């Protein structure tokens, strides 16, 4: 098929990874994928690695900036819009698909001005600034979590595109007769509070329910985190980064982590119960809203960072680790919330809009 698609996503993995999953599906269907990003985001590494053509525009965020930056903002946005319009004219896409990040504002407006169908996808339970602005004139509005956007004939609840291997379910070994397995995902954003909390909390557990521990500490935090575990006499495997997340999820019985949009979707895909500690200063407190999606249904417990110390975490861990059937029930509920066809669904929406 001799047709181009322009994907817009930038900044963080939370925007870029779902977009990459959809890019691969577009390619599998014969489309040529172009990508609109910014010079500073993770897309500069990942998009060329995926063999996709990357176009860059110069735009940054405005929240929390000083007065001078705000005064310059209209000129920056106008320049970014002109750059985006040039890319749209050059690529001539059958549709433009935005997954969030600063790039999507100018890019989405450029699509509108060029008369190209615009589809947006929101990964979080609270829509980001750019997607909120674009929703009014987008042809379709895709959301990962129900009711992120107001009810509309344009709205589609698709779920988040996540790695396919998470859905290749490997039956977990029964908990009977073995230690439970705890996966801690400190990640790279806001990792240190979890890296401090978990060793202290686990040290408070009775020896007979101490779990096996695999702790992702985040880059440059592994040595200090491993030392914390040694100092309190808790055995743990600590790694700065887990390369094979599907394998780690398959190993685990319980996960302690933040509540980023992709993490929530991956927990559901893997069918894993979780204790969620939302990042307290996330924009619009979107991590708390993401966490509520699993917690409302009984697949997770939400533990606010401000009120969760070692004693509170130890008490919750003790409660769930002593009740294997509760863990099993939470796991089944998590799996029931997964959307394994999210990637196909998003691409189907785009193709429907592009070709009428």
Curated annotation (Swiss-Prot):
Keywords: Cell cycle, Cell division, Cell inner membrane, Cell membrane, Cell shape, Cell wall biogenesis/degradation, Glycosyltransferase, Membrane, Peptidoglycan synthesis, Transferase. Its main location: membrane. Pathway: Cell wall biogenesis; peptidoglycan biosynthesis. Its EC number is 2.4.1.227. It catalyses: di-trans,octa-cis-undecaprenyl diphospho-N-acetyl-alpha-D-muramoyl-L-alanyl-D-glutamyl-meso-2,6-diaminopimeloyl-D-alanyl-D-alanine + UDP-N-acetyl-alpha-D-glucosamine = di-trans,octa-cis-undecaprenyl diphospho-[N-acetyl-alpha-D-glucosaminyl-(1->4)]-N-acetyl-alpha-D-muramoyl-L-alanyl-D-glutamyl-meso-2,6-diaminopimeloyl-D-alanyl-D-alanine + UDP + H(+). One of its GO terms (biological process) is carbohydrate metabolic process. The keyword GTP-binding does not apply. UDP-N-acetyl-alpha-D-glucosamine binds at residues 12-14, 124, 163, 188, 242, 287. This is UDP-N-acetylglucosamine--N-acetylmuramyl-(pentapeptide) pyrophosphoryl-undecaprenol N-acetylglucosamine transferase. Pfam families: Glyco_tran_28_C, Glyco_transf_28. SUPFAM superfamilies: UDP-Glycosyltransferase/glycogen phosphorylase (SSF53756). It comes from Pseudomonas savastanoi pv. phaseolicola (strain 1448A / Race 6). Belongs to the glycosyltransferase 28 family. MurG subfamily. It is found in: Cell inner membrane.
């Amino acid at each position: 098929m001799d047709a181009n698609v322009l994907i817009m996503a930038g900044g963080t993995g939370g925007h870029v990874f779902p977009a990459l999953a959809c890019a691969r599906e577009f390619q599998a269907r014969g489309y040529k994928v172009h990508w609109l990003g910014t010079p500073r985001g993770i897309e500069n590494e990942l998009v060329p690695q995926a063999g996709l053509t990357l176009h860059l525009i110069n735009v940054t965020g405005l929240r929390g900036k000083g007065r001078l930056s705000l005064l310059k903002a209209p000129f920056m946005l106008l320049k970014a819009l002109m750059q985006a319009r040039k890319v749209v004219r050059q690529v001539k896409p059958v549709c433009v698909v935005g997954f969030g990040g600063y790039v999507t504002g100018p890019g989405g407006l450029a699509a509108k001005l060029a008369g190209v169908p615009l589809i947006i996808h929101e990964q979080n339970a609270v829509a980001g600034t750019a997607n909120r602005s674009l929703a009014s004139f987008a042809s379709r509005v895709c959301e990962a979590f129900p009711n992120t956007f107001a009810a509309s004939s344009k709205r589609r609840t698709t779920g988040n595109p996540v790695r396919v291997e998470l859905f290749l379910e490997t039956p977990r070994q029964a908990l009977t007769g073995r230690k439970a397995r705890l996966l801690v995902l400190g990640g790279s954003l806001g990792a240190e509070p979890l890296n401090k909390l978990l060793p202290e909390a686990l040290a408070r557990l009775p020896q007979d329910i101490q779990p096996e521990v695999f702790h992702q500490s985040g880059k440059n935090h592994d040595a200090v985190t491993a030392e914390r575990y040694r100092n309190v006499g808790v055995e743990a495997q600590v790694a700065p980064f887990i390369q094979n997340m599907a394998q780690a999820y398959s190993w685990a019985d319980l996960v302690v982590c933040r509540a980023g949009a992709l993490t929530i979707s991956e927990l559901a895909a893997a069918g894993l119960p979780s204790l969620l500690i939302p990042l307290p200063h996330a924009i619009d407190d979107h991590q708390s809203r993401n966490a509520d999606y699993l917690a409302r249904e009984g697949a997770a417990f939400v533990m606010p960072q401000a009120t969760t110390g070692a004693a509170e975490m130890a008490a919750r861990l003790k409660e769930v680790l002593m009740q294997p059937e509760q863990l099993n029930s939470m796991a089944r509920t998590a799996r029931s919330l997964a959307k394994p066809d999210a990637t196909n669904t998003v691409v189907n929406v785009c193709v429907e809009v592009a070709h009428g």
